[in-house]
Amino acid sequence: MLKFLVKAPAKVNLFLHITGKRSDQHHYLESLFVFVNVYDILEVDVGGSKRGVYFSNLRISKYNNTVYKAIELLLKHSAVCPNVSVSIIKNILVSAGLAGGSADAAAIMRLLGNMWNIDYTLLQDLALKIGSDVPACLESKTLFAKGVGEDILLLPDLLLPKYIILVAPRGKTLSTAKVFNNYQSATYSPSICDKLPVKQDDWMELICNAKNDLLEVALKFVPEIEEILFVLKQLKNSVIARMTGSGATCFALFNELSHAEDAARKLQMTRPDWIIFNAKIL
Protein backbone atom coordinates (compact mmCIF):
# COMPACT_ATOMS: atom_id res chain seq x y z
CA MET A 1 0.00 0.00 0.00
CA LEU A 2 1.23 3.50 -0.88
CA LYS A 3 0.52 6.49 1.37
CA PHE A 4 0.51 10.16 0.40
CA LEU A 5 -0.22 13.50 2.06
CA VAL A 6 -1.60 16.13 -0.33
CA LYS A 7 -2.57 19.78 0.16
CA ALA A 8 -5.49 21.39 -1.69
CA PRO A 9 -5.42 25.23 -1.68
CA ALA A 10 -8.51 27.43 -1.60
CA LYS A 11 -9.27 29.63 -4.60
CA VAL A 12 -10.36 33.25 -4.67
CA ASN A 13 -11.99 35.01 -7.61
CA LEU A 14 -10.59 38.54 -7.75
CA PHE A 15 -13.40 39.25 -10.17
CA LEU A 16 -16.14 37.16 -11.75
CA HIS A 17 -18.13 38.27 -14.79
CA ILE A 18 -21.02 36.36 -16.35
CA THR A 19 -20.96 36.92 -20.11
CA GLY A 20 -23.77 34.65 -21.30
CA LYS A 21 -25.53 31.32 -21.01
CA ARG A 22 -25.39 28.12 -23.05
CA SER A 23 -28.44 26.22 -24.23
CA ASP A 24 -27.82 23.67 -21.45
CA GLN A 25 -28.14 26.53 -18.90
CA HIS A 26 -24.44 26.58 -17.98
CA HIS A 27 -23.17 30.15 -17.72
CA TYR A 28 -20.19 31.58 -19.58
CA LEU A 29 -17.76 33.19 -17.17
CA GLU A 30 -14.64 35.33 -17.21
CA SER A 31 -12.71 35.36 -13.96
CA LEU A 32 -9.29 35.98 -12.47
CA PHE A 33 -8.37 33.17 -10.08
CA VAL A 34 -5.74 33.22 -7.37
CA PHE A 35 -4.97 30.51 -4.83
CA VAL A 36 -4.17 31.07 -1.17
CA ASN A 37 -2.42 29.22 1.63
CA VAL A 38 -5.59 27.91 3.26
CA TYR A 39 -5.51 24.17 2.64
CA ASP A 40 -7.58 21.05 2.95
CA ILE A 41 -5.32 18.10 3.82
CA LEU A 42 -5.82 14.79 2.01
CA GLU A 43 -4.36 11.56 3.40
CA VAL A 44 -4.40 9.12 0.49
CA ASP A 45 -3.93 5.33 0.63
CA VAL A 46 -3.56 3.52 -2.70
CA GLY A 47 -3.72 -0.26 -2.92
CA GLY A 48 -5.02 -0.96 0.58
CA SER A 49 -8.15 -2.77 1.74
CA LYS A 50 -10.36 0.34 2.16
CA ARG A 51 -12.19 2.32 -0.48
CA GLY A 52 -14.02 5.62 -0.17
CA VAL A 53 -13.58 9.20 0.99
CA TYR A 54 -13.78 10.05 4.67
CA PHE A 55 -14.10 13.51 6.20
CA SER A 56 -12.62 13.88 9.67
CA ASN A 57 -14.62 16.93 10.74
CA LEU A 58 -17.73 16.95 8.54
CA ARG A 59 -20.68 14.67 7.85
CA ILE A 60 -20.37 14.09 4.12
CA SER A 61 -21.18 10.86 2.27
CA LYS A 62 -18.02 8.87 1.56
CA TYR A 63 -19.32 7.99 -1.90
CA ASN A 64 -21.28 11.11 -2.92
CA ASN A 65 -18.61 13.82 -3.13
CA THR A 66 -16.28 15.41 -5.67
CA VAL A 67 -13.20 13.43 -4.62
CA TYR A 68 -14.91 10.06 -5.02
CA LYS A 69 -16.28 11.15 -8.40
CA ALA A 70 -12.77 12.15 -9.48
CA ILE A 71 -11.32 8.79 -8.42
CA GLU A 72 -14.05 6.86 -10.26
CA LEU A 73 -13.47 8.89 -13.43
CA LEU A 74 -9.72 8.30 -13.30
CA LEU A 75 -10.12 4.56 -12.72
CA LYS A 76 -12.07 4.32 -15.98
CA HIS A 77 -9.04 5.70 -17.83
CA SER A 78 -6.35 3.83 -15.91
CA ALA A 79 -4.67 0.54 -16.69
CA VAL A 80 -4.80 -0.32 -12.98
CA CYS A 81 -7.75 -0.57 -10.60
CA PRO A 82 -6.53 -0.40 -6.99
CA ASN A 83 -8.57 0.56 -3.96
CA VAL A 84 -8.17 4.24 -3.13
CA SER A 85 -9.02 5.58 0.31
CA VAL A 86 -8.90 9.28 1.14
CA SER A 87 -9.22 10.94 4.56
CA ILE A 88 -9.79 14.69 4.36
CA ILE A 89 -9.24 17.33 7.01
CA LYS A 90 -11.40 20.27 5.93
CA ASN A 91 -9.91 23.70 6.59
CA ILE A 92 -11.49 25.42 3.59
CA LEU A 93 -15.00 26.62 4.42
CA VAL A 94 -17.75 24.58 2.75
CA SER A 95 -20.22 26.26 0.35
CA ALA A 96 -18.43 29.56 0.80
CA GLY A 97 -17.11 30.54 -2.64
CA LEU A 98 -13.64 29.09 -2.02
CA ALA A 99 -13.96 25.95 -4.19
CA GLY A 100 -13.16 23.53 -1.37
CA GLY A 101 -14.78 20.54 -3.07
CA SER A 102 -13.21 21.43 -6.41
CA ALA A 103 -9.79 21.91 -4.80
CA ASP A 104 -10.00 18.47 -3.16
CA ALA A 105 -11.02 16.81 -6.44
CA ALA A 106 -8.20 18.55 -8.30
CA ALA A 107 -5.64 17.53 -5.68
CA ILE A 108 -6.51 13.83 -5.98
CA MET A 109 -6.53 14.12 -9.78
CA ARG A 110 -3.02 15.61 -9.80
CA LEU A 111 -1.73 12.82 -7.58
CA LEU A 112 -3.39 9.84 -9.26
CA GLY A 113 -3.08 11.27 -12.77
CA ASN A 114 0.67 11.49 -12.34
CA MET A 115 0.88 8.06 -10.68
CA TRP A 116 -1.20 6.36 -13.36
CA ASN A 117 0.35 8.25 -16.31
CA ILE A 118 -2.92 9.81 -17.44
CA ASP A 119 -2.42 12.41 -20.17
CA TYR A 120 -2.79 15.93 -18.78
CA THR A 121 -5.14 17.03 -21.56
CA LEU A 122 -7.44 14.13 -20.67
CA LEU A 123 -7.10 15.08 -17.01
CA GLN A 124 -8.32 18.61 -17.81
CA ASP A 125 -11.29 17.22 -19.75
CA LEU A 126 -12.21 14.93 -16.86
CA ALA A 127 -11.84 17.79 -14.38
CA LEU A 128 -14.50 19.78 -16.21
CA LYS A 129 -16.94 16.87 -15.86
CA ILE A 130 -16.72 17.25 -12.08
CA GLY A 131 -17.19 21.01 -11.91
CA SER A 132 -16.40 24.30 -13.62
CA ASP A 133 -13.80 25.28 -10.99
CA VAL A 134 -11.92 21.96 -11.10
CA PRO A 135 -9.79 22.72 -14.21
CA ALA A 136 -8.56 25.95 -12.57
CA CYS A 137 -7.94 24.12 -9.28
CA LEU A 138 -5.97 21.51 -11.23
CA GLU A 139 -3.51 24.31 -12.00
CA SER A 140 -3.74 26.04 -8.59
CA LYS A 141 -1.86 29.04 -9.98
CA THR A 142 -2.88 32.59 -10.82
CA LEU A 143 -4.91 32.38 -14.03
CA PHE A 144 -7.66 33.89 -16.15
CA ALA A 145 -10.50 31.50 -16.99
CA LYS A 146 -13.32 31.87 -19.46
CA GLY A 147 -16.06 29.81 -21.08
CA VAL A 148 -17.51 27.35 -18.58
CA GLY A 149 -14.13 27.00 -16.89
CA GLU A 150 -12.31 25.05 -19.57
CA ASP A 151 -10.43 27.89 -21.30
CA ILE A 152 -7.49 28.86 -19.09
CA LEU A 153 -4.71 31.42 -19.47
CA LEU A 154 -1.94 30.98 -16.90
CA LEU A 155 -0.52 34.22 -15.50
CA PRO A 156 2.48 33.05 -13.45
CA ASP A 157 4.31 36.38 -13.57
CA LEU A 158 1.36 38.57 -12.60
CA LEU A 159 2.35 40.93 -9.81
CA LEU A 160 -0.50 41.38 -7.35
CA PRO A 161 -0.81 42.33 -3.69
CA LYS A 162 0.22 39.15 -1.88
CA TYR A 163 -1.62 39.49 1.39
CA ILE A 164 -5.30 38.75 1.72
CA ILE A 165 -7.83 38.39 4.50
CA LEU A 166 -10.89 36.21 3.99
CA VAL A 167 -14.08 36.94 5.93
CA ALA A 168 -17.27 34.87 6.02
CA PRO A 169 -20.38 35.19 8.20
CA ARG A 170 -20.30 32.43 10.78
CA GLY A 171 -22.90 29.70 10.23
CA LYS A 172 -23.92 30.88 6.76
CA THR A 173 -23.43 28.79 3.63
CA LEU A 174 -24.40 29.34 0.01
CA SER A 175 -24.94 26.64 -2.58
CA THR A 176 -23.22 27.51 -5.86
CA ALA A 177 -26.08 25.91 -7.80
CA LYS A 178 -28.64 27.92 -5.83
CA VAL A 179 -26.92 31.22 -6.60
CA PHE A 180 -26.47 30.48 -10.30
CA ASN A 181 -30.02 29.17 -10.66
CA ASN A 182 -31.33 32.43 -9.23
CA TYR A 183 -29.07 34.65 -11.32
CA GLN A 184 -31.10 36.67 -13.80
CA SER A 185 -29.81 39.51 -15.90
CA ALA A 186 -31.35 41.43 -18.76
CA THR A 187 -27.84 42.13 -20.02
CA TYR A 188 -24.70 40.10 -19.43
CA SER A 189 -21.29 41.60 -18.77
CA PRO A 190 -19.31 42.34 -21.95
CA SER A 191 -16.30 40.14 -22.59
CA ILE A 192 -12.95 41.61 -21.57
CA CYS A 193 -10.86 38.96 -23.34
CA ASP A 194 -9.64 41.44 -25.95
CA LYS A 195 -8.83 43.99 -23.24
CA LEU A 196 -6.55 41.91 -21.02
CA PRO A 197 -3.58 44.08 -20.03
CA VAL A 198 -0.15 43.61 -21.53
CA LYS A 199 1.59 45.65 -18.84
CA GLN A 200 1.76 44.35 -15.27
CA ASP A 201 0.72 47.65 -13.75
CA ASP A 202 -2.53 47.70 -15.70
CA TRP A 203 -3.88 44.49 -14.14
CA MET A 204 -4.71 46.12 -10.82
CA GLU A 205 -6.63 48.84 -12.64
CA LEU A 206 -8.62 46.13 -14.43
CA ILE A 207 -9.27 44.27 -11.17
CA CYS A 208 -10.41 47.42 -9.37
CA ASN A 209 -12.79 48.31 -12.20
CA ALA A 210 -14.21 44.78 -12.38
CA LYS A 211 -16.86 43.20 -10.14
CA ASN A 212 -18.55 40.00 -9.06
CA ASP A 213 -21.76 39.58 -11.01
CA LEU A 214 -23.12 37.10 -8.46
CA LEU A 215 -23.08 39.58 -5.57
CA GLU A 216 -26.65 40.81 -6.00
CA VAL A 217 -28.05 37.26 -5.92
CA ALA A 218 -25.87 36.23 -2.97
CA LEU A 219 -27.11 39.23 -0.96
CA LYS A 220 -30.69 37.98 -1.26
CA PHE A 221 -29.75 34.81 0.62
CA VAL A 222 -27.02 36.16 2.93
CA PRO A 223 -27.58 39.91 3.49
CA GLU A 224 -24.69 39.94 5.99
CA ILE A 225 -22.34 40.06 3.00
CA GLU A 226 -23.18 43.74 2.54
CA GLU A 227 -21.88 44.67 6.00
CA ILE A 228 -18.76 42.56 5.56
CA LEU A 229 -17.91 44.34 2.31
CA PHE A 230 -18.60 47.74 3.86
CA VAL A 231 -16.23 47.01 6.76
CA LEU A 232 -13.52 45.55 4.51
CA LYS A 233 -13.60 48.60 2.24
CA GLN A 234 -13.09 50.87 5.27
CA LEU A 235 -10.02 49.00 6.50
CA LYS A 236 -6.85 51.05 6.52
CA ASN A 237 -4.53 50.16 3.60
CA SER A 238 -7.06 47.82 1.97
CA VAL A 239 -6.40 47.84 -1.79
CA ILE A 240 -9.70 46.25 -2.82
CA ALA A 241 -12.57 44.34 -1.20
CA ARG A 242 -14.97 41.99 -2.98
CA MET A 243 -16.96 38.76 -2.67
CA THR A 244 -15.38 35.60 -4.08
CA GLY A 245 -17.23 33.05 -6.19
CA SER A 246 -20.89 32.58 -5.30
CA GLY A 247 -20.22 33.73 -1.72
CA ALA A 248 -20.57 34.21 1.09
CA THR A 249 -16.83 34.67 1.70
CA CYS A 250 -15.40 38.13 0.97
CA PHE A 251 -11.79 39.27 0.80
CA ALA A 252 -9.58 42.32 1.11
CA LEU A 253 -6.13 42.65 -0.48
CA PHE A 254 -3.10 44.33 1.11
CA ASN A 255 0.38 45.17 -0.15
CA GLU A 256 2.08 44.66 3.22
CA LEU A 257 1.91 41.71 5.63
CA SER A 258 1.74 44.00 8.66
CA HIS A 259 -1.29 45.80 7.23
CA ALA A 260 -3.13 42.52 6.67
CA GLU A 261 -2.20 41.28 10.15
CA ASP A 262 -3.43 44.50 11.77
CA ALA A 263 -6.72 44.32 9.88
CA ALA A 264 -7.29 40.65 10.69
CA ARG A 265 -6.47 41.23 14.37
CA LYS A 266 -8.91 44.13 14.57
CA LEU A 267 -11.71 42.08 13.01
CA GLN A 268 -11.02 39.05 15.18
CA MET A 269 -11.32 41.21 18.29
CA THR A 270 -14.52 42.97 17.25
CA ARG A 271 -16.46 40.48 15.11
CA PRO A 272 -16.89 37.07 16.76
CA ASP A 273 -19.79 36.49 14.35
CA TRP A 274 -17.35 36.37 11.42
CA ILE A 275 -14.84 33.70 10.43
CA ILE A 276 -11.54 35.36 9.50
CA PHE A 277 -8.48 33.95 7.74
CA ASN A 278 -5.24 35.89 7.37
CA ALA A 279 -3.68 34.37 4.25
CA LYS A 280 -1.24 34.85 1.39
CA ILE A 281 -1.64 34.45 -2.36
CA LEU A 282 0.49 31.57 -3.64
From Swiss-Prot:
Q: Which UniProt keywords apply?
A: ATP-binding, Isoprene biosynthesis, Kinase, Nucleotide-binding, Transferase
Transmembrane portions of the chain? none
Which biological process, per GO, is one annotated for this protein?
isopentenyl diphosphate biosynthetic process, methylerythritol 4-phosphate pathway
- Which pathway does it operate in? Isoprenoid biosynthesis; isopentenyl diphosphate biosynthesis via DXP pathway; isopentenyl diphosphate from 1-deoxy-D-xylulose 5-phosphate: step 3/6
Pfam families, alphabetized: GHMP_kinases_C, GHMP_kinases_N
List of residues binding ATP:
L93, V94, S95, A96, G97, L98, A99, G100, G101, S102, A103
Example GO molecular function: 4-(cytidine 5'-diphospho)-2-C-methyl-D-erythritol kinase activity
Lineage, top-rank taxon, reads: Bacteria
Extract the coiled-coil ranges from the record.
Answer: none
Where are the active-site residues found? K11, D133
Q: Give its E.C. classification number.
A: 2.7.1.148
Keyword presence, Repeat: no
Q: Which InterPro entries match?
A: GHMP_kinase_C_dom, GHMP_kinase_C_sf, GHMP_kinase_N_dom, IspE, Ribosomal_Su5_D2-typ_SF, Ribsml_uS5_D2-typ_fold_subgr
Looking at the keywords, is ATP-binding present?
yes
Kindly give the SUPFAM superfamilies that the UniProt entry links to this protein. GHMP Kinase, C-terminal domain, Ribosomal protein S5 domain 2-like
Describe the reaction catalysed, as an equation: 4-CDP-2-C-methyl-D-erythritol + ATP = 4-CDP-2-C-methyl-D-erythritol 2-phosphate + ADP + H(+)
The record's similarity note reads:
Belongs to the GHMP kinase family. IspE subfamily.
- Which PANTHER family does UniProt cross-reference here? 4-DIPHOSPHOCYTIDYL-2-C-METHYL-D-ERYTHRITOL KINASE, CHLOROPLASTIC
Quote the function comment for this protein.
Answer: Catalyzes the phosphorylation of the position 2 hydroxy group of 4-diphosphocytidyl-2C-methyl-D-erythritol.
This chain belongs to which protein, by name? 4-diphosphocytidyl-2-C-methyl-D-erythritol kinase
Gene name in the database record = ispE
